[in-house]
Amino acid sequence: MRGLFLCSLMPLPYRPQPGEILICSFDDVACGAEMIKRRPVVVVSCHQSHRRNLCTVVPLSTTAPTPVMAWHHPLPHLSVTGWKASAPMWAKCDMLATVSFVRLNQPYLKSRSGGRRFVPHALLAGDLAAIRKCIQIYLIM
């Protein structure tokens, strides 16, 4: 496998499950300190009742927060295809966002022949519970 590609223009063709790690394109428009660029996210909620192909995600980053607060959760054991393997991941629960499936895709590898191999990722149940707790802390502060 030669090149590494992280996101395509095709929307996610299924309803993602909480704990699933996807790639989100925040490229379109950002104001002020809003999230930008393509980055991994963890799905924290995706209700059938939305019926608008929306889900709520928490962005992941290899940049450690300064200072580390109660709403940041370290994920040192997590490695997402295409991201720096040596840098530990952080869940930035203060950057919670509801996004369209159009912004989401699974990470994938691209072969020399042009094919794609999607690489599914999911958090451990304990990490998802910790991230949800961090969201609660942030929202009630």
Please tell me what each predicted stretch does.
Residues 30-38, 43-81:
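Compact nucleic-acid interaction/catalytic patches
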Residues 1-6:
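Short, structured beta-strand/loop micro-motifs enriched in basic residues and often containing a Trp
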Residues 78-141:
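C-terminal terminal-subdomain/extension
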